[in-house]
A protein has these predicted regions:
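Conserved acidic residues
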Residues: 22, 55-56, 102, 156
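Phosphate-bearing ligand-interacting subdomains
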Residues: 31-89, 93
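Hydrophobic, well-ordered beta-alpha structural blocks that scaffold small-molecule cofactor pockets
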Residues: 1-38, 43-51
Length: 202
């Protein structure tokens, strides 16, 4: 699903992991064309002709509209019985007792430490790290190089920008936004945006 920058990163992981690619769904591209060597099938309605027992889906949709399209598509096809691949780049590291739901994506250099729980649709981007006992709700996006220290709790849909640091035990509420490079020293409420060092609500 998708044909933007995030989709290219997902495509790279799929190829490194040896998956057989049927094609991509991307309404902005003409059906029957090629995208980075992959067949363009059309928009997501082409899945109506494919049994959920025959295919796995990979979510390459990025964060346009704060990721709402990404969430809507993933949740809709989950509810119809389709499975979303959990993708782990070969250079990512995760502890054996960490738990990943379907549809989680660990990109190159990502680290997930012991006791972590990552719910469906979470993205841990390039070289980001999630330390021990963190809990990340559905569709949380951790940007490149961000650091979550131990026992951080992040609710559904929150966004943590590139290079941000979240100190131990902090709670980020649903749909909270943490700006790039922010240092979060206190909890951030649902729907709030925090930026700066130390991070303050904007």
């Amino acid at each position: 699903m998708g044909a933007g920058g995030h989709a290219r990163v997902v495509l790279d992981v799929l190829r490194l992991r040896g998956y057989q690619l049927l094609g991509i769904c991307a309404p902005e591209l003409p059906a029957g064309s090629k995208w980075h060597g992959v067949d363009v099938l059309g928009d997501d309605t082409v899945l109506d002709d494919l049994s959920c027992d025959e295919v796995w889906l990979a979510n390459g949709i990025g964060l346009a509209q704060r990721g709402m399209v990404r969430r809507r598509i993933q949740d809709a096809y989950f509810s119809r019985g389709y499975s979303w691949l959990t993708l782990e780049h070969p250079s990512s590291l995760r502890a054996s007792d960490s738990w990943l739901a379907d549809g989680v994506q660990l990109m190159a250099g990502a680290v997930v430490q012991p006791g972590c729980r990552l719910e469906s649709g979470v993205v841990i981007n390039t070289c980001a790290s999630v330390d021990h006992d963190c809990q990340l709700g559905e569709h949380v996006f951790v940007g490149p190089g961000a650091v979550l220290c131990g026992a951080v709790k992040v609710d559904r849909g929150a966004f943590i920008g590139a290079g941000a640091v979240v100190l131990p035990g902090i709670h980020l509420g649903e749909d909270a936004i943490i700006g790039a490079g922010a240092v979060v020293i206190r909890s951030v409420g649902a729907g709030c945006t925090a930026v700066g060092n130390p991070a303050r609500n904007r």
